Amino acid sequence: MAKPILLSIYLCLIIVALFNGCLAQSGGRQQHKFGQCQLNRLDALEPTNRIEAEAGVIESWDPNHQQLQCAGVAVVRRTIEPNGLLLPHYSNAPQLVYIARGRGITGVLFPGCPETFEESQRQSQQGQRREFQQDRHQKIRHFREGDIIAFPAGVAHWCYNDGSSPVVAIFLLDTHNNANQLDQNPRNFYLAGNPDDEFRPQGQQEYEQHRRQQQHQQRRGEHGEQQRDLGNNVFSGFDAEFLADAFNVDTETARRLQSENDHRGSIVRVEGRQLQVIRPRWSREEQEHEERKERERERESESERRQSRRGGRDDNGLEETICTLSLRENIGDPSRADIYTEEAGRISTVNSHNLPILRWLQLSAERGALYSDALYVPHWNLNAHSVVYALRGRAEVQVVDNFGQTVFDDELREGQLLTIPQNFAVVKRARDEGFEWVSFKTNENAMVSPLAGRTSAIRALPEEVLVNAFQIPREDARRLKFNRQESTLVRSRSRSSRSERRAEV
């Protein structure tokens, strides 16, 4: 009698464990408030805030806009001039960054990881070693145009433009991610400098800065200290004596950490020659060779991951130690395309299968290019919101909601942003100059379902279902299913013929 009872209890425990495991796997994002995605109209958005720094420009979109609130994200575009340094900072939300132009280096500061890049011991002119503290730091990573870079929440990072042209980078912050346990406001915490709040309108910034300045000066006055302009980094609010004790330095050096009277902003110009950090030096040929080797290693590691999944071996979701984590994948290289149609264009994707850290961040991305007059067939995103940033050119875009209403029917141009909510259907058609975009998606493995073409939902339906659903002859149903042999990207009919048909109507 006891055995059946024990068996029942054991089975119940297994079911509970499996249920909890499923919740843990699918719990990457916080729930939306009711009605947050009840959007009757979408707009192509321009940046609403612009901040000029010493060596660059920061432009952001209003994170309180209904479209971005629906997707649960914030977006900022940073332009870093040659020899410009984006100061070290971390965010309350995980970030995906797309490098739209330029190249440079970045450092990501994982806590507890060793300083694997170190300076060699130098010798004096007499050939004898001098006693000095060698510089050591964590790994330096190169980036170039077309790269997607992942930054986990709370992990500090910096970027430097070591090229001859500006770096333009699009940062998406997933504020609805469970890694963010603050509110839904995007927050950047700077380790240096006196930066402005990228997401706050200039008038509000000036008021808040003035209020904090008064409070800080009042506190200094109570301690009999000389009044100074308040900095805006994480060290600014501490007493200089505490910092001096923590770093074992004098008080004057500690005050320099607080960046008082520093008006350079969050992107500063490196003085003199280029930033001197410890990193391997490559020629262009060596760098291209190393990038080819890296792509080969990524393909091999992807093959190994597939084999391990088929073999039933469990993994940690990252496949690497934290300290050697891959953070970058290039999706701008045409040879990297996942979908390619010779006359229409190409699409590349990055997800947790080819960049495992995205399983942690619960994000993915798509990079697309449509040639002149080409069409990205109507489709919907099954499991993610899509935030589309137009990189080059123009496209006609239509978006349809669950009521069959057109919520967007307009042109999307370079530099604009469009949010496409989950399950809303969308179609894109390039103008004469073509169209290129990057889409950030709020799922580690975002899935797309086409409405037309070889892999579409219509193609998958039986003819009899189409005949009865649309009240059409069987021949028309067959044409709907089989007239388009391409899967996703197709060559559109000429715009002139479309204009003629519209004129006839």
UniProtKB/Swiss-Prot annotation:
Record motif NGXEET, residues: 316-321
Disulfide bonds: 37-70, 113-323
SUPFAM superfamilies tied to this protein: RmlC-like cupins
GO MF entry, a single one: nutrient reservoir activity
CDD domains, alphabetized: cupin_11S_legumin_C, cupin_11S_legumin_N
Superkingdom of origin: Eukaryota
SMART domains to which the protein is assigned, alphabetical: Cupin_1 (SM00835)
Gene3D superfamilies assigned to the protein according to its UniProt record, in alphabetical order: Jelly Rolls
GO biological-process terms attached to the record: seed development; seed maturation
Domain Cupin type-1, chain residue ranges per copy: 42-255, 329-478
Family the UniProt entry places it in: Belongs to the 11S seed storage protein (globulins) family.
Function: Seed storage protein.
Binding partners and assembly: Homohexamer. Each subunit is composed of an acidic and a basic chain derived from a single precursor and linked by a disulfide bond.
PANTHER family: 12S SEED STORAGE PROTEIN CRB (PTHR31189:SF35), OS03G0336100 PROTEIN-RELATED (PTHR31189)
Name of the protein this chain belongs to: 11S globulin seed storage protein 1
Organism of derivation: Carya illinoinensis
Lineage of the species this protein comes from: Eukaryota, Viridiplantae, Streptophyta, Embryophyta, Tracheophyta
